[in-house]
Each structure stands twice: as C-alpha cells, then as structure tokens.
Amino acid sequence: MLKLFSAFRKNKIWDFNGGIHPPEMKTQSNGTPLRQVPLAQRFVIPLKQHIGAEGELCVSVGDKVLRGQPLTRGRGKMLPVHAPTSGTVTAIAPHSTSHPSALAELSVIIDADGEDCWIPRDGWADYRSRSREELIERIHQFGVAGLGGAGFPTGVKLQGGGDKIETLIINAAECEPYITADDRLMQDCAAQVVEGIRILAHILQPREILIGIEDNKPQAISMLRAVLADSHDISLRVIPTKYPSGGAKQLTYILTGKQVPHGGRSSDIGVLMQNVGTAYAVKRAVIDGEPITERVVTLTGEAIARPGNVWARLGTPVRHLLNDAGFCPSADQMVIMGGPLMGFTLPWLDVPVVKITNCLLAPSANELGEPQEEQSCIRCSACADACPADLLPQQLYWFSKGQQHDKATTHNIADCIECGACAWVCPSNIPLVQYFRQEKAEIAAIRQEEKRAAEAKARFEARQARLEREKAARLERHKSAAVQPAAKDKDAIAAALARVKEKQAQATQPIVIKAGERPDNSAIIAAREARKAQARAKQAELQQTNDAATVADPRKTAVEAAIARAKARKLEQQQANAEPEQQVDPRKAAVEAAIARAKARKLEQQQANAEPEEQIDPRKAAVEAAIARAKARKLEQQQQANAEPEEQVDPRKAAVEAAIARAKARKLEQQQANAEPEEQIDPRKAAVEAAIARAKARKLEQQQANAEPEEQIDPRKAAVAAAIARVQAKKAAQQKVVNED
C-alpha cells in the first residue's frame, strides 16, 4: 500500500486555471512519415534567427560554401548560422523575413549547386569524456536554439542554469491545433530524441528528468515508452489535453506544482525546460557533428493537397515548400506561420524558413470561418476565465487602447504568453492578442529609450566628475608650484632679494657734508653717460638696419626734392595770403630749420654710404639740366613781374639754402664721377635734345607771360632753385666735354 501511495505521489500532476479546448485538427498531418523536400534553387538565410544580436559575418559575396559551413561567428550570446547546402554566396543584403510585418533583415543569399556537399564532420560519440564547458561551447557554435518557438540560444540557457537545476523538463505537449512536428519527430526519431535528452542531463546533472506529453499522441507515447523501457532515470508523464498546457510556466506547474515567480525564470525554482526538437538538434550537433541546417515543419490546411511533416532546410522559401505539397490557393488565400492561435499571417510567400518555423497553415475559405467584425467589449469576463496566466485581459485591453502604459505594467501585461485563449472565447471578436503585442512593444521601446537616456546621463556625469578631478588636480599642481618654486626661480628670487638689501644698505648710509668741498657726482655722471652711449649705439644699429634695407636712388632723391620744394612753395603762399595777425614765432622757425638741416645731413650720409645700384645716364642728365635752366628762367621772369616789394629776402636763410643746394650739387657730381659710363653720348643727339629743351622752355615762357599771375612766387625759393639749376647746367656741360674727349 505504501508503494502505491509513493507511486501516486511520484506521478501526480497538477492543473492550472483557465485554458480552452479548441478543435485539434492534428489528424490532417500526423499520419504520414517525415519526408525530404527537393532542394530549392535559392536560399535566404537571415543572420538573426534567435533572441539576441546577430553574429558577425565571416563570408563575402562570391564565396563557395558547403553545407554546415558557418556564415557568422558566434561570440557571447550571438548565435551563428550555417549554410543549409553547398553553393555560392550571391548577395548579402536586407531581405524580408518571417515576421508579422515582414521586416527586412540582413541575410545571406546562396545559389545552390545541387551537390549538397557537407563540411568535414567530427562527431563526439564519447561525449561523456568531454567537459561540461566543451559540450556547451559545441552546442552554441553549432547554432542550436530553442525550436519550440522562443528561439533562445540553448548554449546560453544551459550555461545560465549552472549547478542549481534539480529538474529537467522535456516539453513534448505540442498543444496548439494543427501542429504535429514534435509528434511526428517522436514517432520517427524517438531514440535520437532520448539520446539528446541524455546529453542535456549529462551537462546539467539534475535530480530528475521529466517528459511531459499530452494524451492525444498515442503513437508517440508508445515509441517513447519502448525506448525508455530499460531506463529508470527518465520519467514519461502523460497529461490531459488542454490548451495551452505546452506553455513553459503552465507545463512546469502541471509536472512539479511549482509556479515561476513574477518577472523571474524557471531556473529560479530549480527547473530548466527544453523542447523535443531542441533535444534532437543537440544529439546531431554533439554525436553526429552536424550544425542545425534543417528542422521539421508541418504543412497542413485544406488548401494543401498533400499535408504532412517535412524536413525543411533553413532558408528555403515558403512558396517552395507549399508548391511541393500541392498548394492550391484561392482568391483570398491566407498562409499562417505557426498555429491558428499563436501564429501570424504572412504578407507574401517569399519569406524563408527559420529556426522557429514549426508549421505552415494554409486553410480554405470555410475552414476558419468568415472573419467577424470587431465589436465593443461587453465586460462578460469570459477572457479572464480563460486566461491561463490569471490576468485581467479586459482591463489590459482598455489600458492598451488608451496608451496607459503604467497601468498596463502594473497589471502584469509582461506575464501574458500571447496564447490567444482570451481572443478565442471573446464574444465581441476583439483581437486581444494584437493589442497586447503592440502594447508590450511600445513599453519595450519606452524602456529602451529610458535605458539609453540613463546611460547618456551616466556618461555625462562621469565626464563631469572626470573634468572636476582634472581641474582639482591642476589647481593642486599650481598651488604646489607656487609654494615650492623651482631651483632657477629660487636663484632669481635670492638675487633680487640681495639687490634690494644692497640698495637698502646704501640708502641707510649717512650723507656727510663737508664745508668748502663739492659733492662727488662722478658715479651718477658715469651712469648717465653710459645710458646715453647705449641709446646712441641702439640708434646707430637701427640706422644701419634701415640703410641696409633702403638703398638711395638718385632719381628718386631728385623727385623727392622737387616734391618737397613744391610743398614748401604752397606753404609759403598760404602763409603770405594769411591774415597779418598770425605772427611767426622765431624760436619755432629756428627749431624747424635745425630739424631740416639734420634731415639733410642724414640723407647725404645715406646717399654717400649707399652703393650705387644704377648708373646715371648722361643723356638724361643733359636733358634734365636743360629743363632745369628753362624752369629757372621762367621763375626769374615770374619773380620780376609778380614779386611784391614789401617781401624782403632774409640774407641768412638765402645763404643757408644756397649752401644746401651746393652740397646737393657736389653729391650729384660725385655720383656721376663714380658712375662708369656705359654708353657714349652722340654729340648730334645731345645738340638735338638741347634744342628741343630750349624750344619747350621758350614755349613755357610765352604761356606764362600771357597767363594772368594767379600765384605769388617766393623770391627766396626762386633764388635757391636758380642756383640749383645753374649748378646742374654747369655739371652737364662739364660731363659733355668729358664725353667728347
């Protein structure tokens, strides 16, 4: 009797709240064995077929690949994908994938060569001699993921379980209508499934292993019992048929009576669950050395002539599978990927088969009934009664429709498994699952944005803290430098202090006054003379620099002198026409005359020291002399006609100006004497030029005689100009005689 009670407690099962019993419709496809599908010509392999980030590409366009060759690298939680057959990579581009919105994801497109050649396979038949880490790494690198629908990387799941797993559950319930992929796999490959379960048990080392299967699969139950006849470590549990008993939380509660905590995982209560198809893929990866390149897919529905279960290569277009099964589409034909309750309608049929594709349902127009129009909620609570997660779907519906994300989160919308039981029983035909999916996606987007904002804030605060630390360190360095000067700074400070002390000592010496003696100012006089000498030396150096930069040009000097004379004449005329009350200060005039003499001496020195860069042309000099004589005669006539008797010429100024003119004439003669005559003057040309100059002078005199005297000529300047003209004429005549000789 005690053994009976122990056996009863050992095989006890629990029941969850809610659930429904829809028509199963499994007999359409579970009566025929698994079969192979001819290879498609073109395969589209999305890089992301699992939960997590996509892997890193390791192939490029034009590469030849073999079946089982990795297309991406799996690092961390990134799961690699493998080539489903041998062929050539023709493109790596975004392509629509198996998603309700057919979103485009980066995919590798391969053209098959028809040979279907494998890569070299290295199986581990003695897997028990391998370490736990080696087995997990092999499972991960061979691309094994959860094939029950979630697509979570199996290697990551096993690694996270660690040594705290007490119960390993194999999910063989397959509760959704129409789907028979796991049922047929257990009927045809029961031994391989059990071998995969043993590999998982070797990795996790659990206390018990449970296989949960619904009682509507008698053939699969018989095959498993036959394989497990001599095994006592694996227990087969047959449970009543009820939707959704295949859910992870629901099956865990049915077999163990434990509930997964809100927001937690099954590993928190010592339970880890794997699918039947996943166990089979683990066996092929470890023992056979074959990455996951195909899976069992159910082809069913009244629009398919030959329904059944097939081995479908990953990346095969859906259209290719349906056409092989005798697909007869109607005018408004729909194709559902997954079951009728949790699946989604495909926008078109060019999407590929992926790791989580377990069923392709092509119903006829009458099979699922006419679509009903959505109506208002009547608050009947039928959805709450059917919910297996003990939620309030009607409240979640209102919160989702009203964009009340906080209230939806408070009412545990994250615990919804999207089984569709609430929508199945709703008398108002409200697609509750669609509302819940959209609401969860919006909440996830909001949380992701908040996470990015928090990370950005953390980065900003870290940067501010770093800048503050750098600023504090910089200030500390400055303070240290101010408190502790460098060695050379110490020497300079000491020298300055010594000078100050010396001056103070000198200042404190008493001044002794002796009668009859003069004070000794020799030191002060010597210092003053030294400063003057230093100033003169600096001025001389500056003068030499200016002389080197500027070389005197005789022609430019003559032009500048003429401009100066013109400006002087204009100034004198203005002074002569000015009102008599403006008197000239003799002292200022004397100062200006002295400044002018100094400038003249400086200019003469520059011209004397400058190297003559250009030679004076004698012909030009002769012409200039003739022009000067003409101008002199013109000035004399103007002076005689227009000079006012009241203006008297100062003899001293005239003498000074005459001396300046003589000095300029001597300087010009020296330049001409030092200049090497490059060209000989033709006497005939010189005579012609002189005649032309005299003609121009006479013409100018006539014009001046006829013109009304508008301007008053300064007699002193006229005298100076006449003297200069006579000197230039005499010099030109001498030069002409020298050239003729």
Swiss-Prot record:
<dbReference type="GO" id="GO:0005886">
    <property type="term" value="C:plasma membrane"/>
</dbReference>
<protein>
    <recommendedName>
        <fullName>Ion-translocating oxidoreductase complex subunit C</fullName>
        <ecNumber>7.-.-.-</ecNumber>
    </recommendedName>
</protein>
<feature type="binding site">
    <location>
        <position position="387"/>
    </location>
    <ligand>
        <name>[4Fe-4S] cluster 2</name>
    </ligand>
</feature>
<feature type="binding site">
    <location>
        <position position="416"/>
    </location>
    <ligand>
        <name>[4Fe-4S] cluster 2</name>
    </ligand>
</feature>
<dbReference type="GO" id="GO:0009055">
    <property type="term" value="F:electron transfer activity"/>
</dbReference>
<comment type="similarity">
    <text>Belongs to the 4Fe4S bacterial-type ferredoxin family. RnfC subfamily.</text>
</comment>
<dbReference type="InterPro" id="IPR017900">
    <property type="entry name" value="4Fe4S_Fe_S_CS"/>
</dbReference>
<dbReference type="Pfam" id="PF13375">
    <property type="entry name" value="RnfC_N"/>
</dbReference>
<comment type="function">
    <text>Part of a membrane-bound complex that couples electron transfer with translocation of ions across the membrane. Required to maintain the reduced state of SoxR.</text>
</comment>
<keyword id="KW-0997">Cell inner membrane</keyword>
<dbReference type="InterPro" id="IPR011538">
    <property type="entry name" value="Nuo51_FMN-bd"/>
</dbReference>
<feature type="binding site">
    <location>
        <position position="419"/>
    </location>
    <ligand>
        <name>[4Fe-4S] cluster 2</name>
    </ligand>
</feature>
<keyword id="KW-1278">Translocase</keyword>
<dbReference type="InterPro" id="IPR026902">
    <property type="entry name" value="RnfC_N"/>
</dbReference>
<dbReference type="GO" id="GO:0046872">
    <property type="term" value="F:metal ion binding"/>
</dbReference>
<keyword id="KW-0004">4Fe-4S</keyword>
<dbReference type="InterPro" id="IPR010208">
    <property type="entry name" value="Ion_transpt_RnfC/RsxC"/>
</dbReference>
<feature type="domain" description="4Fe-4S ferredoxin-type 1">
    <location>
        <begin position="369"/>
        <end position="397"/>
    </location>
</feature>
<feature type="binding site">
    <location>
        <position position="422"/>
    </location>
    <ligand>
        <name>[4Fe-4S] cluster 2</name>
    </ligand>
</feature>
<dbReference type="InterPro" id="IPR017896">
    <property type="entry name" value="4Fe4S_Fe-S-bd"/>
</dbReference>
<dbReference type="GO" id="GO:0022900">
    <property type="term" value="P:electron transport chain"/>
</dbReference>
<feature type="binding site">
    <location>
        <position position="426"/>
    </location>
    <ligand>
        <name>[4Fe-4S] cluster 1</name>
    </ligand>
</feature>
<keyword id="KW-0249">Electron transport</keyword>
<dbReference type="Pfam" id="PF12838">
    <property type="entry name" value="Fer4_7"/>
</dbReference>
<keyword id="KW-0813">Transport</keyword>
<comment type="subunit">
    <text>The complex is composed of six subunits: RsxA, RsxB, RsxC, RsxD, RsxE and RsxG.</text>
</comment>
<feature type="binding site">
    <location>
        <position position="377"/>
    </location>
    <ligand>
        <name>[4Fe-4S] cluster 1</name>
    </ligand>
</feature>
<keyword id="KW-0479">Metal-binding</keyword>
<feature type="binding site">
    <location>
        <position position="383"/>
    </location>
    <ligand>
        <name>[4Fe-4S] cluster 1</name>
    </ligand>
</feature>
<feature type="region of interest" description="Disordered">
    <location>
        <begin position="627"/>
        <end position="654"/>
    </location>
</feature>
<keyword id="KW-0677">Repeat</keyword>
<dbReference type="Pfam" id="PF10531">
    <property type="entry name" value="SLBB"/>
</dbReference>
<dbReference type="Pfam" id="PF01512">
    <property type="entry name" value="Complex1_51K"/>
</dbReference>
<keyword id="KW-0408">Iron</keyword>
<keyword id="KW-0472">Membrane</keyword>
<feature type="binding site">
    <location>
        <position position="380"/>
    </location>
    <ligand>
        <name>[4Fe-4S] cluster 1</name>
    </ligand>
</feature>
<keyword id="KW-0411">Iron-sulfur</keyword>
<keyword id="KW-1003">Cell membrane</keyword>
<dbReference type="InterPro" id="IPR037225">
    <property type="entry name" value="Nuo51_FMN-bd_sf"/>
</dbReference>
<dbReference type="InterPro" id="IPR019554">
    <property type="entry name" value="Soluble_ligand-bd"/>
</dbReference>
<feature type="domain" description="4Fe-4S ferredoxin-type 2">
    <location>
        <begin position="407"/>
        <end position="436"/>
    </location>
</feature>
<dbReference type="GO" id="GO:0051539">
    <property type="term" value="F:4 iron, 4 sulfur cluster binding"/>
</dbReference>
